[in-house]
Swiss-Prot record:
PANTHER family: FATTY ACID/PHOSPHOLIPID SYNTHESIS PROTEIN PLSX, PHOSPHATE ACYLTRANSFERASE
Name under which the protein is recorded: Phosphate acyltransferase
SUPFAM superfamilies (UniProt xref): Isocitrate/Isopropylmalate dehydrogenase-like
Organism of provenance: Thermoanaerobacterium thermosaccharolyticum (strain ATCC 7956 / DSM 571 / NCIMB 9385 / NCA 3814 / NCTC 13789 / WDCM 00135 / 2032) (Clostridium thermosaccharolyticum)
GO MF term (any one): phosphate:acyl-[acyl carrier protein] acyltransferase activity
Lineage: Bacteria, Bacillati, Bacillota, Clostridia, Thermoanaerobacterales
Keyword hit for Transferase: yes
Length: 333
């Protein structure tokens, strides 16, 4: 298995990217292609079995227009990595760079799964009862009912493979649990999912997500991104508050020692870097978006996630599911 990694994308590239890559090579039996500017990588990269460096001369920054950047900067680390995936030279591509450019490049060069109108970002969120898949988390700010229905179908397959759940519970994000709640979009989506083969549990509210009420939560990208950032911020604040309180005086420091293992487990469970990145579900090959602020730990886990997606053949399973229920999707449009 070969995974291409964008060495130049993200706030801490290329140092933290390369550190995550080396950790992955130590732990997994895979090959990694590090795509980036060799002049900048030379001080961080050493010869390692399973590692190849592909030199590029350009980088796409976060403030560039996505479509224009991916078309103009053909020798950027992101564009070259996507091209390698398209040609079959690698099995998956991972980047912590410009989200819009990654989506645009994936759509233009690789394309969508037949039957999927819009791909979706699908991060795995930590919850009290395990984990929940959220989609879309920011790719599509304006959606039609069919888009959210398709997100639910893809999320269902992804949960089966990645969370090992036979019949995932599917929830529709809304402002209330009652069927009649919400706007015109959510009301139409409710009917589509309710009348499908999915294990639909109805509407879920913001507080339900953290409790793990649903295995998959579908929503538009505007709402999904707000949920994602809110949960990340809440987890960070709780972690900081715990540290502050436990360092307050000698007594609290002693107490922290006694409950250290428990606290460590809590912090780890709330840490988004443990869950890797967000795949672009709906693209014909595995593309994973890592958080822009990813450090080595997050990159390592995103590579682990990419490896699992390839091993579990997630994309093919989504394709087959869409083919099987194609008539239902067509009828819903």
């Amino acid at each position: 298995m070969r995974i291409a990694v964008d060495a130049m994308g993200g706030d801490y590239a290329p140092l933290e990217i390369t550190k995550g890559v080396y950790k992955a090579l130590e732990n997994f039996n895979i090959e990694i292609v590090l795509v980036g500017n060799k002049d900048q990588l030379d001080k961080y990269v050493k010869e390692e079995k399973g590692l190849t460096v592909v030199h590029t001369t350009e980088t796409i920054t976060n403030n560039e227009p996505p479509v224009a950047a991916i078309r103009k900067k053909k020798d950027s680390s992101m564009a070259v990595g996507i091209d390698m995936l398209k040609k079959g030279e690698v099995d998956a591509f991972l980047s912590a760079g410009n989200t819009g450019a990654l989506m645009a490049g994936s759509l233009l060069k690789i394309g969508r799964i037949k039957g999927i109108d819009r791909p979706a970002l699908a991060p795995i969120l930590p919850t009290l009862n395990g984990a929940t898949i959220l989609l879309d988390a920011g790719s599509n700010t304006d959606c039609k009912p069919i888009n959210l229905f398709q997100f639910a179908i893809m999320g269902n397959v992804y949960a089966q493979k990645m969370l090992n759940i036979d019949n995932p519970k599917i929830g529709l994000f809304n402002i209330g649990a009652e069927e009649e709640k919400g706007n015109e979009l959510t009301k139409q989506v409710y009917d589509l999912i309710k009348n499908s083969h999915l294990n639909f549990i109805g509407n879920v509210e913001g507080r339900d997500i953290a409790y793990g009420v649903a295995d998959v939560v579908t929503c538009d990208g505007f709402v999904g991104n707000a949920i994602l950032k809110s949960m990340e911020g809440t987890a960070s604040v709780i972690s900081s508050l715990l540290k502050q309180e436990l360092q307050r005086n000698l007594l609290t420091k002693l107490g922290a020692i006694l409950i250290y293992n428990g606290l460590k487990n809590i912090v780890k469970k709330m840490d988004y870097t443990e869950y890797g990145g967000a795949p672009l579900l709906g693209i014909k090959k595995p593309v994973i978006k890592a958080h822009g602020s990813s450090k080595s730990k997050a990159i390592f886990n995103a590579i682990r996630q990419a490896k699992t997606i390839v091993e579990m053949d997630v994309i093919s399973h989504i394709q087959r599911e869409i083919e099987l229920i194609g008539d239902d999707i067509s009828a819903a449009k």
